[in-house]
Amino acid sequence: MNIPDKPSLEGLEEKWSKLWKSSKIYNFELEQVSAKQDVYSIDTPPPTASGVLHIGHVFSYTHTDIIARFQRMQGKIVFYPMGWDDNGLPTERRVQNYFSVRCDPSLPYCQNLKLAQINNDSMARSISRRNFIELCQQLSEEDERKFEELWNYLGLSVDWSQTYRTIDDDAIHLSQHFFLENVNSGAAYQDWAPTLWDVTYRTAVAQAEIEERQITGFYYRLAFENENATVEIETTRPELLAGCVALVAHPDDNRYKHLFGSHVITPVFDVKVPVLPHRAAQPDKGSGIAMVCTFGDITDVQWWRDLNLQSCPIIDASGRVVPDAPDPIVSERGRRAFATLSGKTLSAAKKHTLEMLISEKSIIGEPRKITHPVKFFEKGDKPLEILLTRQWYIRNGYSDNALTERLIELGKQLQWYPKTMLRRYEGWLTGLNSDWLISRQRFLGVPFPIWYQTDDRGNAKFDDPIFPDRKDLPLDPTIAVPRGYSENQRGAPNGFVAETDVMDTWATSSLTPQLAGKYLKNPKLFEAIFPYSLRPQGQDIIRTWLFSSIIRSEYAHATAPWKSTAISGFILDPDRKKMSKSKGNAKTPKDILDRYGADAVRYWAACARLGVDTALDVENPTQIKIGRRLALKVLNAARFVVHLHKNKETYSGQPDMKRCYPIDFAAISNPLDLSLLKQLDQTIEQSTNALKNFDHSKALDTTETFFWNFCDNYVEIVKDRAYAGDESALTTLLVVTNIVIKLLAPFIPYATEEAWSWFNETSVHTQSWPETLKLHSGDIELLKIACSFMSLVRGGKTEAKLSQKTEIAYLKIALPNPEIIMPIMDDLRRAGKIDKCELIDGDAQILAIEYGEISR
């Protein structure tokens, strides 16, 4: 092994990642598993394969890799797969923008369609659904190759023979299999119900995909008339007036008790609607009486259900007013008014409705400006609407107390890191307002394996679904034909039609334990790794990925899919805002990795405590710079020890780390050396316990503190003795270097592998994790006082603006318990270049110092 005169970090990533991959040191070998306890399995988050990874991915995936490397060194057979989430809206949008295409399911498939990147919406071309899906797969595969390159450069110890995708045939087969299982058990069902709807994407949205944003709006006070009085209501959505089906007030509100059971007439549209009591009405909100529309918000849905109101939808899937007036509008005046709204966007409809209200003097006073929370699809830019639609659902405990209690119990059975994250899971579960909506009106996704019989006119009979035989999976019902039918019966009277909706991406991602573990293809593998040891993930998807995975596992296996879960925090920009691609403040990791190296970036990630948000200023990444300095110091320290042993006659050529075990304790006799090893024992124990509890930050800090003390103090103190060939010093240096490289290996794998290679031909990442030496001799206080001595001497020279090489003729120094360091005063005097030294018991300080040549 050629050891450079000046060690460098440049090129280590390419050198070692290639060797690791070719030697397959991270591959999971099922035949090596003799018992479940031998395995440590990780349900790795599959990153969304749409564009580029950002620095937040590097942050959280490093945390997982540290644990994987630690468990491997602990003797576990680690199952560490990698998946690609290439299914869903992000991929669709990327393909639309990249190729400038739009999917039109009515178009025929075009064979051998080849498109290049265009990025020009004005040139958008319509293509068939099948062609669109092929482009999605093509671009996803290109993105996945880039992702794999970055993960390899970062040093993830992933088993690249264990990869999966969320939209390939295996994923479709698995998702369809478990969907049919859920249908058979009653866990999955179809319903026509109010649905949260994104008008931009034209798809239903689940509760877990919603975020609230503060929006500026106005309260408008409208006048409704009854036979004896005017009733005033306040609303932020006058455009929904045509869909009003009732007014509601709290049953104890004396202002409106006399109206309960009566009717009022809506302004402009002249619809007669009832006034009803309901305890969800808020007397202190607005005028205290509310307009019920179908539907303005979730409360409207509650009132509609509880009061058994009629539905009067006026918004279509594109977010425009429907073409025909709803049935309750019967007056000629009302129908004429509605005709002027037909086809308008909601913002235009609001403006025009207000104009009509003003013209008939049904607006009272001036609008009142407010800021209020409005629900959005997390990927959308327009407020969500609520439409009556047919959708597929999976029961999640919303209306089943026994299931809720079971899911809470499964959550409590997990080891949560940090523990506080359990409260988020429980809070989400107890705050559900619907079952889990799993169908989407999109193009890319797992098809529902369903057809429907048609009636005499060719209309789908949704109450008569046709399900396939399990042996026919995977399938696309828009291409495949159900058994007993022929293709010419598709869409024909008394024939069949395919379900065109696809499954929500979480309906597939919720099955990553089964998908990565090849539940259908390799039962022995799945048996060996399930339940998984760990699910690492972000805190923002507890309500989606984690919760949905527990639901699916409970239905499939009656258990939680993992034993523990580790939740990472967010990466914040310098303004303390969460970095995300959607907000445009996310930084790609390539530049910073190229500039500082993978080990430095991993160090920065490891310094953050699990679950805690961490800020990053990419222009001045202080911790990353510190990490680079640490990695270089590891190389320089190892080089120093190697050369010491090469220069010793008893060693020929390359020192062998194996020589350290079993340790010849008889060779380690110096009190300072024994004190250092005692402190090393403490470091091993603390670092090991920290990593077992997923506290990588504490483990790194503990080891790093010991290492810098070793380099800055111990090495300087024993250097002369080591150069002189002292066996105690040389053995101690070799032992400590061995162990420190191992302790740092999970954090900075490249520098530690390089340093290890100078001593041994094996990989440090296949070595056993260090165990405490359990020394019976050695006083840990000795090293502490010796370090204090050296710190005072250095400080004195620095204060006098002298070189550290300046000799001291006489030193009088006070230290607590100075007699402890008397046996090593020769080492200390040589290290500090001191001729005469007088020790005094007291608080640590220099009492007198005279600089001058040492008498020789």
Curated annotation (Swiss-Prot):
It is an enzyme of class 6 (ligase). GO terms for cellular component: cytosol. Its main location: cytoplasm. ATP binds at K581. A motif ('HIGH' region) lies at residues 47-57. It catalyses: tRNA(Val) + L-valine + ATP = L-valyl-tRNA(Val) + AMP + diphosphate. InterPro entries: aa-tRNA-synth_I_CS (IPR001412), aa-tRNA-synth_Ia (IPR002300), Anticodon_Ia_Val (IPR033705), M/V/L/I-tRNA-synth_anticd-bd (IPR013155), Rossmann-like_a/b/a_fold (IPR014729), tRNAsynth_Ia_anticodon-bd (IPR009080), Val/Leu/Ile-tRNA-synth_edit (IPR009008), Valine-tRNA_ligase_type_2 (IPR022874). SUPFAM superfamilies: Anticodon-binding domain of a subclass of class I aminoacyl-tRNA synthetases, Nucleotidylyl transferase, ValRS/IleRS/LeuRS editing domain. It is found in: Cytoplasm. ValRS has two distinct active sites: one for aminoacylation and one for editing. The misactivated threonine is translocated from the active site to the editing site. Belongs to the class-I aminoacyl-tRNA synthetase family. ValS type 2 subfamily. Monomer. This is Valine--tRNA ligase.
